[in-house]
């Protein structure tokens, strides 16, 4: 019985140590989520305005740009998967990988070969273990991405897209060959309690038209010209799309981690309470047995006299 009591006390200490870790992770995530949300909210107006400007350019001028034109018989599709660098964030990464596999299946059914790009160590490890050839990977900033990180990623993706598919071979390769489409898989932040894994095509670009109030049509003049202005804005637009996805994912990761660590802390509390109750019962049983043995011994001595 004493051995069982020692075992219970050891389990209580272990649960207490785990609780300290999960509580610390919960507090860290809680402290960072507000800043992540603020960065996300501050980036959204810029993304909206640059999208509106490109919409105006596309509507008012006849533009023929590689990032606007659908390619005949596309064979290779670049896919950027945005994951986390660290774990302890619930089903955050599992949902991303599940959504990515769904996209890969759709691409293969359409006769397109996925070409993989990843952000985050979790995606790097996940796809390396499954023998995927990862064309390019970026790590170390999943919780706090910068615009420079997004610009580097967008530059790599745009270069691959502009290079295009030359040989038409249908194989996974990290040889630097071009792609005919660009997709991004990330987690959209909706609220502290709701995040969803999303997949969007970013090239060839689908211009998102914004509804305007009914009234006289506004006429625009472009200086120096619409094509040059479009070519100047387009890299910023694509970088902004990637940056927004990184910020959405960062906020979602922190929210998932905060929620997962709170759940783990609550479970540790429940486990400690249950183990403490069991330990108290074992201790009471041990004391009762000891008292019974003492009383029995005293009675035996009294009878012997």
Swiss-Prot record:
Its main location: membrane. GO terms for biological process: proton motive force-driven ATP synthesis; proton motive force-driven plasma membrane ATP synthesis. SUPFAM superfamilies: ATP synthase (F1-ATPase), gamma subunit. It comes from the Bacteria. It is found in: Cell membrane. Gene3D superfamilies: 3.40.1380.10, ATP synthase, gamma subunit, helix hairpin domain. InterPro entries: ATP_synth_F1_ATPase_gsu, ATP_synth_F1_gsu, ATP_synth_F1_gsu_CS. Pfam families: ATP-synt (PF00231). It is a peripheral membrane protein. Belongs to the ATPase gamma chain family. Produces ATP from ADP in the presence of a proton gradient across the membrane. The gamma chain is believed to be important in regulating ATPase activity and the flow of protons through the CF(0) complex. F-type ATPases have 2 components, CF(1) - the catalytic core - and CF(0) - the membrane proton channel. CF(1) has five subunits: alpha(3), beta(3), gamma(1), delta(1), epsilon(1). CF(0) has three main subunits: a, b and c. This is ATP synthase gamma chain. It comes from Mycobacterium tuberculosis (strain ATCC 25618 / H37Rv). The gene is atpG.
